[in-house]
Amino acid sequence: VYRNFLEMQNLNDLHYKKLKEMNFTDDYIKENQFKSIENNKNKKKEICMKLQEQGLKLDGIPGFFQDTDFKWTYKSHKGIFIPVTLNNKIQGLRILLDNEYRLDTENIWFSSNNEYNGTKASNWPMILKDNTVNWIDMYNSDNSTSIIIATEMILAHKLFNNTNKTVIGIPNNIDKDLILSIVQRMNASEVFLYADKYTILHTSTLMYENTVKSLERQNIKVEFRVALNENDIGSELKENEKNIKIA
């Protein structure tokens, strides 16, 4: 549903310029389906109707809901859709907002749980990897590796774009269990944990400490880094690449 839905969205000049300022190439933008959100009321319903004509069901899909006329539509936001991909499937859509939301966050889920027949989004992780890396091999490797985790999807894309290393993106509320699950599944011995501005300002210090301590109890080294100059983020990993094996 999401893949076809994104094909019906466009990318406006303002958002294109914003993405280019983040050092994303045209090919990267197209390949990852970064799109502006269509907010015209009639066009939204036309898009939903086209999806249904393709045989796709919208009930149970986060972000979609039925309007007062019982026609399907979706939640309106001003921003850019960031697809959250896991195992070759778009599990959900994260939104990079034009204007900051509550508590100064620029990132929210495409969700419709408070609407009629709407659905709440789950806290999905995202894995960005080179096309030559096989999903099964990545999860079942016996070799111990270092992995990169970023506490927001757009930050994960910046890291992947700058390093071409496997990057795991997670929502910016630092889900300890989610991080532990990913690290164990990928047999990681070292974690480079990058935090965005919102996470630093609004996430409990205790939550950070619990996450780091849980990893260290399993003899996993943690390199905690704050993403200050986000557009150049990850450059230090390139400099140290000879000394560390990053997935």
Walk through the language-model features, giving the residues of each.
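Non-catalytic accessory segments of DNA primases and related replication-initiation nucleases
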Residues: V1-D67, Y198-T199, E209
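Generic structural signal for hydrophobic core residues of well-folded globular domains
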Residues: F5, Q9, V84, E236-L237
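Short, exposed beta-strand "edge-strand" segments with a Pro/Gly-rich flavor and a Y/T-containing core
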Residues: K18-F24, F34, E115-D137, A227-E239
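A residue-level signal for conserved active-site and pocket-lining positions in enzyme catalytic cores
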Residues: L19, N88, L193
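A generic structural signal for short, non-catalytic loop/turn and secondary-structure boundary residues
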Residues: F24, I29, K75, D142, ...
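Short, solvent-exposed polar/charged micro-motifs at secondary-structure junctions
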Residues: E38-M49, D104, D232-E239
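Phosphate-handling DNA/RNA-contact segment within nucleic-acid enzymes
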Residues: K43-N187
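TOPRIM fold recognition
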Residues: Q91, L103, S144-I147, M153-A247
